[in-house]
């Protein structure tokens, strides 16, 4: 056997021979996401594992998604809805609901920022998707990755890959997508508004709130209990003050581990041969439209409240009504600080932001109640 024949056989058995243009295209997309995560620092905790999962799965013959493959094993946490629910528990342990409790009007802003969910649902039904598929696509507009995975698993499991990738990618790209919309819809005067300090919230209120939310929402929409139940359990860990170890684990070690596995699993759904088709492009377009309309809905209600209150509410906090916590609130703070460096909107924006988490989960529960039997 000659050297050249050995070399030829080696090349034929290598990934180079099996590399397709779809793999190359997705690898290039992963490089763009690497750049955004590492250089631009666009939510690297999410974008870096997603982009690396996308990169790995498009390396031919690696077997990562084969039966028994390491990422395939991880992906069971996505398919079973375990990861989304555990992420919600970690988010609950990290979240202070005081801004929402102190300023209940934030609930309205959180609700208005779900506009994109329903707009995308209507659009999706008009371009060939079933109502159940359209509902799963629409949830992307809530900028809530765990909820998007949860509803896709239940209503449109065959669309889980593009929905999950779109939802998490747009969450990570919030600092790029939202500011132009926010600036286009508000005046310099509105963006510079300084809001008054929020009232102090008692410990009793903080403890009663998660219990009351789960009680009401789960009785109204039972299908939302796994998500909101674990979200509020994590928050109760935090606010009770008696299980500090559980709270620390949920908001640090546990959510970090789950984020790594969830990010890799979501990114690994973007395999070139199955990901690059017309339905995926439609979903990505619908997801972007949903996200933009959600931002628009929140800002427009913020402008209305600005007028009603005589200029006491900064419309920028409305854009934080999407449920990407705390990314959307940070964007409101950043845009507001550019107009008025002494402005501190972060805590005010956290009210609509955490309301958006509840709002998107409730929207998902409503869709599941209506469309679960129509798959």
Go through each PLM region and give its residues.
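Alpha-helical transmembrane segments
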Residues: 159-176, 286-294, 317-320
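Transmembrane helical segments that form the transport core of multi-pass membrane transport proteins
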Residues: 214-298
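Membrane-embedded hairpin module used as a gating/binding unit in multi-pass transport
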Residues: 169-242
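Hydrophobic transmembrane alpha-helices of secondary-active transporters
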Residues: 33, 55-56, 77-101, 234-237, ...
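Alpha-helical membrane segments and immediately flanking helix-loop junctions
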Residues: 76, 80, 88-94, 109-119, ...
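Interfacial helix-loop-helix linkers and transmembrane-helix boundary segments
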Residues: 39-47, 64-74, 94-109, 243-251, ...
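N-terminal alpha-helical transmembrane segments of multi-pass membrane transport
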Residues: 1-69
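Entry/N-cap segments of selected transmembrane alpha helices
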Residues: 100-121, 271-298, 349-353
């Amino acid at each position: 056997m000659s050297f050249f024949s050995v070399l030829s056989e080696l090349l034929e058995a290598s990934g180079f021979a099996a590399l397709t243009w779809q793999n190359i295209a997705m690898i290039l997309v992963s490089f763009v996401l690497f750049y955004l995560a590492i250089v631009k620092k666009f939510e690297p905790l999410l974008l870096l594992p997603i982009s690396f999962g996308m990169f790995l799965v498009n390396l031919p013959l690696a077997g990562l998604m084969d039966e028994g493959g390491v990422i395939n094993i991880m992906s069971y946490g996505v398919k079973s809805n375990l990861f989304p629910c555990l992420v919600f528990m970690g988010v609950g342990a990290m979240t202070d609901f005081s801004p929402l409790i102190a300023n209940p009007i934030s609930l309205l802003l959180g609700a208005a920022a779900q506009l994109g969910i329903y707009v995308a649902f209507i659009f999706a039904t008009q371009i060939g998707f079933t109502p159940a598929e359209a509902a799963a696509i629409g949830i992307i507009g809530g900028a809530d990755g765990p909820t998007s995975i949860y509803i896709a698993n239940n209503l449109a499991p065959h669309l889980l890959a593009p929905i999950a990738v779109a939802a998490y990618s747009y969450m990570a790209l919030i600092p790029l997508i939202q500011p132009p919309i926010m600036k286009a819809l508000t005046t310099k005067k509105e963006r510079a508004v300084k809001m008054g300090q929020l009232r102090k919230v008692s410990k009793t209120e903080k403890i009663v709130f998660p219990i009351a939310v789960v009680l009401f929402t789960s009785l109204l929409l039972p299908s939302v209990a796994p998500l909101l139940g674990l979200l509020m359990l994590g928050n109760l860990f935090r606010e009770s003050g008696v299980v500090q170890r559980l709270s620390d684990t949920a908001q640090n070690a546990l959510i970090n581990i789950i984020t790594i596995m969830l990010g890799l699993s979501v990114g690994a759904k973007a395999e070139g041969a199955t990901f690059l088709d017309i339905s995926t492009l439609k979903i990505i377009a619908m997801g972007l439209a949903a996200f933009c309309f959600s931002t628009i809905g929140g800002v427009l209600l913020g402008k209305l409240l600005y007028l009603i209150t005589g200029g006491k509410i900064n419309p920028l906090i409305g854009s934080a009504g999407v449920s990407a916590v705390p990314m959307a609130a940070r964007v409101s703070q950043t845009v507001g600080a550019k107009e008025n460096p002494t402005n501190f909107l972060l805590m005010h924006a956290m009210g609509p932001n955490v309301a958006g988490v509840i709002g998107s989960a409730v929207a998902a529960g409503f869709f599941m109640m209506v469309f679960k039997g129509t798959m």
